[in-house]
Structure formats: structure tokens, C-alpha cells
């Protein structure tokens, strides 16, 4: 039995697609299109490294992640972007993007904003978890088309003030998926200014 707030959630997209395809006969080669699942064997040396480091795999990791991993992530951000981060305040390893994106909505989206249901801005095409996380926190997903004219990034700048004032979150993906457009520093700066 699920809480009432989850009763209106749609079925995830990939099982819906599977149901549409089931029962159809196909000729020719078939390909496993499982999303995000590696399709190739890992290099053999990885097996040796894993076997050499099995100690500790019988316990759950710390809630905040493995400290050595967090420090490595902080170091990478500094080397790559010159950004100074704190491993205990800015880094939280998650089991995958779905978990992290969903939990961000759960943590940041209020029940009401300006006495009404908040919006969550979502670029379209979109990653299914954007919509599901918005619906899970009783927010209204507002899909913003991304096309050649917008540089394949969402144009949140043209939205009316009454929508922006009721917006609790806005998703941005750079590079955009599936188009691969990369947000510029100017775009991201303008987006932060819009949010403020």
C-alpha cells in the first residue's frame, strides 16, 4: 500500500514502452536498449582490483559516502574548474542520477508557493525522473521545449513573472540530453540571476 500522494503517479516510461512492444513479432536483429546499463564486458584488470579490495563490501557505506571518494571528487572539481568545495558540505555521492534528482525535489520543493501549487520547470525532451519527482512533491511539471531556436537548452527567461514566482525548481542538463548542447557560462550566470 502506497501513500495517497503517490496514487496519481504515471507508470515509468520504459515499462510503458515495453508494454506497447510486447506481443509484436520482429524480424532481424534485436538490441537490448536497457537505459544506462553497460552492455560490454568490463576489462579483466577490474576483476583483479575488485577481488583485491573486497574487505568492507559486507557492510553498508557511510550515509554521507566514502570519505576518500568525496575528497577525490573535491580534488577533481578544483583541478577541472578551479572551484573550492567542502567534502562534507558540497558533495553527496548517490547511487545514480535518478536517486539524486528525485531527492533534490523531495528536499527543496515546498508544498505550496505563493499559496498555490508550485511549478517545476523541465526541459523537453526530458529525463523521466524530472516529471516523477515533481509530481511526487505535488508540484506541477511545466515542460519547456528545447529546439534549434533555443540552442537545445530550455529558455526559462521568457516565462512570465507569475510563473517564475511560483517556481520551486528548474532542471537544467548540460550537455543537454539527447541533443548534446552545452550551456555557456553566460547562460548559467543568467539562469542563476533569474533564480535569485
List each language-model region with its residue ranges:
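Generic N-terminal amphipathic, Lys/Arg-enriched alpha-helix
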Residues: 1-7
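N-terminal small-domain helix-loop-helix segment of the aminotransferase-like
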Residues: 7-99, 103
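Conserved core of the PLP fold type I
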Residues: 58-196
Amino acid at each position: 500500500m502506497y501513500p495517497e500522494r503517490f496514487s496519481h503517479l504515471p507508470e515509468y516510461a520504459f515499462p510503458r514502452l515495453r508494454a506497447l512492444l510486447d506481443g509484436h513479432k520482429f524480424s532481424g536483429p534485436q538490441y537490448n536498449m536497457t537505459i544506462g546499463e553497460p552492455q560490454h564486458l568490463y576489462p579483466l584488470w577490474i576483476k583483479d582490483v575488485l577481488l583485491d579490495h573486497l574487505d568492507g563490501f559486507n557492510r553498508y557505506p557511510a550515509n554521507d559516502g566514502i570519505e576518500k571518494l568525496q575528497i577525490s571528487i573535491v580534488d577533481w572539481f578544483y583541478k577541472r574548474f578551479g572551484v573550492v568545495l567542502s567534502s562534507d558540505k558540497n558533495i553527496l555521492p548517490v547511487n545514480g542520477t535518478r536517486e539524486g534528482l528525485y531527492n533534490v525535489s523531495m528536499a527543496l520543493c515546498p508544498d505550496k508557493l505563493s499559496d498555490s501549487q508550485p511549478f517545476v520547470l523541465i526541459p523537453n525532451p526530458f529525463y523521466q525522473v524530472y516529471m516523477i519527482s515533481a509530481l511526487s512533491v505535488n508540484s506541477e511539471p511545466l515542460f519547456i521545449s528545447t529546439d534549434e531556436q533555443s540552442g537545445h537548452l530550455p529558455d526559462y527567461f521568457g516565462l512570465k513573472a507569475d510563473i517564475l514566482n511560483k517556481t520551486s525548481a528548474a532542471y537544467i542538463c548540460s550537455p543537454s540530453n539527447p541533443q548534446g548542447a552545452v550551456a555557456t557560462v553566460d547562460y548559467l550566470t543568467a539562469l542563476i540571476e533569474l533564480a535569485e
